[in-house]
UniProtKB/Swiss-Prot annotation:
Promotes RNA polymerase assembly. Latches the N- and C-terminal regions of the beta' subunit thereby facilitating its interaction with the beta and alpha subunits. NCBIfam families: rpoZ. This is DNA-directed RNA polymerase subunit omega. The keyword Transmembrane does not apply.
Length: 134
């Protein structure tokens, strides 16, 4: 049954490797609960997927697009870039002004430490215990 189904599908999808990818993807969709578009006739999911492709109840192009979307991890969104450089320039100036204002308001005073105080502090540190993890 499956061999005849594959031969029927080659007319719809010329590349057998692509056919395997599409049918496998559709079979996984059926396993996850997607509605089938033909009678099951006690066939397993891969055979049902091949029969759906052969009967053209599903478009191979739609399946291919769905497969691509299921494999994508990062989807780039095309946005207009014509107005973006002007906005970036003005927003970078605003950010610079905001940082300057914040720096004036939140001046943090650090304690000054002499070299002797620093050395005394370092001598007071306890070395970590050696273990055999390395």
């Amino acid at each position: 049954m499956a061999r005849v189904t594959v031969e029927d599908c080659v007319d719809k999808v010329e590349n057998r490797f692509e056919l395997v990818l599409l049918a496998g993807h559709r079979a996984r969709q059926i396993s996850q609960g997607a509605q089938i578009t033909i009678d099951r006739d006690n066939d397993k999911n891969p055979v049902v997927a091949l029969r759906e492709i052969a009967d053209e109840t599903l478009s191979p192009d739609d399946l291919k697009e769905d497969l691509i979307h299921s494999l994508q991890k990062h989807v780039e969104v095309d946005e207009p870039e014509a107005a973006a450089p002007a906005q970036i320039a003005s927003s970078s100036e605003e950010v610079a002004e905001g940082i300057a204002d914040a720096a004036e308001e939140d001046m943090v005073a650090f304690d000054r430490m002499s070299e002797e105080e620093l050395l005394a502090g370092i001598e007071g540190l306890v070395a970590p215990e050696k273990n055999d993890d390395f």
